């Protein structure tokens, strides 16, 4: 069949085999399988017919959702459901780190596995705690819309990796390894002593302020307060984190064009928008009043094409077996 993939278990068991001759999808399957074996669990053969409505390369965790599907199938068929959400997520992370050579964390995998809006805390080094909570957009008359502005033509690897590296450098100047090991006030008290990279200072300030905004949203049921935090987060990403365009391709700013046009179309009380995903290219997220959705979609479609403007919702279910629901 067209699109059929097949992963040989014997190759998975060979730890020297990195599946370099196979497709990205096959490498993910192999990576998840090997991670499961490394954790001491079982794998086996199965046939699966897979369809998806997750948009690829759009900041909505398409690879992580596929990894969690494969991990969930293996967990149910061969391990009696004994693998935890964290273990399934780590299997997906391993697949990307080792078989894709991509420095993925656990955020996307946990979000897909848990379902709903998910609060995550990575303060304990090497671990994550998480809980699901509600974002009351639909019940308050708002719709989420993703606008895919295009991939861009720059290699984004250096742009992505520079963000944590610069934050690590500031943390080191403050005498610790990570920014969460110290405080915003300690950073502000010593800001004149940290020299050589002003962008790193701005990104550090974003880190501390963003964590405060996350805590506010998690604890709030006030839709206006939640929207305000999203709007402030978007401005901070644009101004402080600076992940809305690529330094080496400054003439290509589709993200900032989409944000600027959205703000024009939305007005002062029609909703909010921000860069989505890793940034630098790709997708923005808009949360729009239902009464303005059709007009907003039409206007953004005229610029970015209708196929790139999608109404979305947050699925309340994570990694589940349908018959158990």
Region roles according to the model:
Residues 2, 50-56, 89-99, 124, ...:
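Acidic, glycine-rich active-site loops and adjacent beta-strand->loop/helix elements
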Residues 278-285:
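N-terminal pre-core extensions flanking Radical SAM catalytic domains
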Residues 116, 280, 315:
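A generic "binding-loop/recognition-motif" signal
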Residues 1-91, 255, 261, 265-266:
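Anion-binding (especially nucleotide phosphate/pyrophosphate-binding) glycine-rich loop
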Residues 58-146, 323-324:
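Fold-level recognition of mixed alpha/beta catalytic cores in primary-metabolism enzymes, strongest
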Residues 1-24, 35, 42, 119-274, ...:
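C-terminal nucleotide
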Residues 28, 50, 66, 88-91, ...:
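Internal, well-ordered alpha-helical segments in soluble enzyme and binding-protein domains
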């Amino acid at each position: 069949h067209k699109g059929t993939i097949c992963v040989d278990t014997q190759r998975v068991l060979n730890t020297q085999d990195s599946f370099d001759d196979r497709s990205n999808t096959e490498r993910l399957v192999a990576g998840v399988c090997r991670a499961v074996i490394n954790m001491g669990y079982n794998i086996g053969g199965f046939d699966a017919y897979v369809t998806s409505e997750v948009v690829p390369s759009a900041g909505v965790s398409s690879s992580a959702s596929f990894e969690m599907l494969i991990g969930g199938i293996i967990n149910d068929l061969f391990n009696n459901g004994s693998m935890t959400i964290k273990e399934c997520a780590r299997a997906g992370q391993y697949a990307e780190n080792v078989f894709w050579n991509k420095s993925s964390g656990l955020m996307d995998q946990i979000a897909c596995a848990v379902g709903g809006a998910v609060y995550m805390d990575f303060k304990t080094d090497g671990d994550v705690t998480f809980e699901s909570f509600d974002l009351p957009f639909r019940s308050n008359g708002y719709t989420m819309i993703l606008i895919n502005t295009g991939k861009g033509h720059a290699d984004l690897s250096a742009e992505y990796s520079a963000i944590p590296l610069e934050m690590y450098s500031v943390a080191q100047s403050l005498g610790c390894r990570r920014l969460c090991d110290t405080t915003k006030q300690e950073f502000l008290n010593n800001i004149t002593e940290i020299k050589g990279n002003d962008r790193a200072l701005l990104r550090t300030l974003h880190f501390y302020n963003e964590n405060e905004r996350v805590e506010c949203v998690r604890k709030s049921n006030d839709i206006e307060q939640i929207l305000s935090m999203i709007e402030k987060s978007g401005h901070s990403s644009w101004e402080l984190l600076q992940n809305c365009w690529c330094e080496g391709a400054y003439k290509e700013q589709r993200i900032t064009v989409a944000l600027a046009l959205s703000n024009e179309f939305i007005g002062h009380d029609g909703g909010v928008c921000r860069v989505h995903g890793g940034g630098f290219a790709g997708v923005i997220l808009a949360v729009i009043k239902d009464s303005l959705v059709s007009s907003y979609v039409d206007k953004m479609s005229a610029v970015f094409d209708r196929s790139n403007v999608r109404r979305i919702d947050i699925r309340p279910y994570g990694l589940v077996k349908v018959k158990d629901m």
